[in-house]
Amino acid sequence: MFLTHLEITWKIKIMENKDSEKLLKLLTKNEDEIIEYKVNNNDHERIGKYISALANSSAILNRQFSYLIWGIDDDSKEIVGTKFYPKTEKHGGEPFITWLERMLDPRITIRFEEYDINQNHVVVLVIHMKAGRPIAFNGSR
């Protein structure tokens, strides 16, 4: 069962972040070629592959942005929270986000946004696709 717009609005009413309306709109959408929900996936290589796939899907669909969202149950869209904190993650001693950006070719803009919703941590990765060619992660498209 999917949450209704009203139910999602109620769930994030405590949010203090000004971007809550943007998050609300994302949470009303089902997974598709440009939106992917995860709960606790912190496998760095897999995240990089997701970014490449989502960015390339954005290009094919002529969409500027795609999203990878942690802390949301795929099926119910319930806000369950995540233990993934990208801004403090490390990959081999290097900051995770720096490593991730370095592994993408060509470089694209990615932005991690973090929210606390009713004591549940939610992370939204915004992938801005503006490159004129397919995005590769670690040499693979």
List PLM regions with ranges.
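Conserved N-terminal catalytic/coupling substructures associated with nucleotide/phosphate chemistry
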Residues: F2-R141
